[in-house]
Amino acid sequence: MSEQEVKELDLNGEMLVRREKLAALRAKGNAFPNKFRRDVLAQDLHNQYDSEDGEILKEKGVEVQVAGRIMTRRAMGKATFITIQDMSGKIQLYVARDNLPEGVYKDEVGTWDLGDIIGVKGTLFKTKTDELTVKTTEVQLLTKALRPLPDKFHGLTDQEVRYRQRYLDLISNEESRRTFIIRSKVVAGIREYFISKGFMEVETPMLQVIPGGASARPFVTHHNALDVDMYLRIAPELYLKRLVVGGFERVFELNRNFRNEGVSVRHNPEFTMLEYYQAYADYHDLMDNTEELLRKLAIDILGTTIVKYGEYEFDFGKPFERITLHDATVKYGADKGIVKEDLYDFDRAKATAERLGIEVQKSWGLGSIVNAIFEEVAEHHLIQPTFLMAHPAEISPLARRNDENPDVTDRFELFIGGREIGNGFSELNDAEDQNERFDAQVAAKEAGDDEAMFKDEDFVVALEHGLPPTAGEGLGIDRLAMLYANAPSIRDVILFPAMRQK
């Protein structure tokens, strides 16, 4: 018999015993009571009483009602020490036969298993080891767990099981709970920041007839009542800019985007983005906003501007570096023989890319080739927080052209730890230029570029009504959460990541 078969046999045996206990509970009446009310969380008790002297605490006779899942139990004859876990943390219980009504210790407490959810009433005291504990006087089983918890000494170590059965991961791993608490604080902090700056939170369509706002492959679905193919949105950008045209001059949205692309440690097909738009601002203002926001999040969440991620340490209290895409490519590509002139001539750029082993697509112009060279030689060097600026117009179809050099745009990408965290630019508000760039994207799609943008005629019409000078930015919430939680994979910060079917 294999080790796996032995484990399954043991599991089936334990579940059978637990089901028999549940059957006995059903025979007595309500097996899942719902009248117990907790009046305090475990961590609140620790915060208030951990430093309290044991004798003084005993004299106070603090009564509490706590509830949670049984994580450990240690029987000692007529008494049992139990640790329960609630959403805030853990608290120890002292359950003694002599402190409970007759028969309760044997007939009820004796049947409890790890994983069961209980509610108790009692008074606080300190053990000989000075551990805050609840001396229970009333107990109640609230939920009988039919399956055992993962091994208490090794926890849940199988990564795939952690992602597929996130509930077990959250029960077993304190670090995972901490990660998702940090993620929640990131979202709350962003919302608070933009509302304090006078932005209005809005919601735009998830189902779109024309998927716009980014270069990506969309998910396709069909609306039966309208008998029309629709797309899960890849970005809310074009709808948000319509709102600026309509007079809502500061808007933001925190919501999901969908892209029918690969899965990796940095990519999930369903992900959360912040997008915001600010009239009468340019991309320099947005870079300033971003530095301020990330600094504030670090202080609020971590208590410091120092953010540690893997082997790296970032100080969000310092100004972020700002460098153009062309300058970064020359700076970090010098050891590969790249010079400035290679990036301003199509033939030289194409030859340079091919020398680097880049497969140049037929639909690429000079801008796309230069961007591919940057990604090959420079992107992974942008470790410290860096704003990469002045992207080629060819790869920035929604961004405003630079006044001094119309071949590039007033655009930036934020890189931290060699990864793109955000993307923003001064918005293109020239309707005729936008129409021409959409046409160029259509030509690229017809030439085989699956990720080229669709043309949105209605958006062009909106621009023809007049978009004020505006700047907009998108920040990846998942990647920000990875950063503040020091999580190596995007799956670690998404509660239920996309997984291949078994």
From Swiss-Prot:
Keyword Ligase: yes
GO MF annotation, one: lysine-tRNA ligase activity
GO cellular component: cytosol
CDD domains (alphabetical): LysRS_core, LysRS_N
Gene Ontology terms: biological process: lysyl-tRNA aminoacylation
Note on how the cofactor is bound: Binds 3 Mg(2+) ions per subunit.
Alphabetized InterPro entries for the sequence: Aa-tRNA-synt_II, aa-tRNA-synth_II, aa-tRNA-synth_II/BPL/LPL, Lys-tRNA-ligase_II, Lys-tRNA-ligase_II_bac/euk, Lys-tRNA-ligase_II_N, Lys-tRNA-synth_II_C, NA-bd_OB-fold
Residues holding Mg(2+) 1: E413, E420
Catalytic activities: tRNA(Lys) + L-lysine + ATP = L-lysyl-tRNA(Lys) + AMP + diphosphate
Record keyword Transferase present: no
Cofactor: Mg(2+)
Cellular localization per UniProt: Cytoplasm
Keywords: Aminoacyl-tRNA synthetase, ATP-binding, Cytoplasm, Ligase, Magnesium, Metal-binding, Nucleotide-binding, Protein biosynthesis
Location, primary (coarse class): cytoplasm
Binding-site positions, Mg(2+) 2: E420
SUPFAM superfamilies membership: Class II aaRS and biotin synthetases (SSF55681), Nucleic acid-binding proteins (SSF50249)
Self-association state and partner proteins as the record states: Homodimer.
Family: Belongs to the class-II aminoacyl-tRNA synthetase family.
Protein name: Lysine--tRNA ligase
Organism: Haemophilus influenzae (strain PittGG)
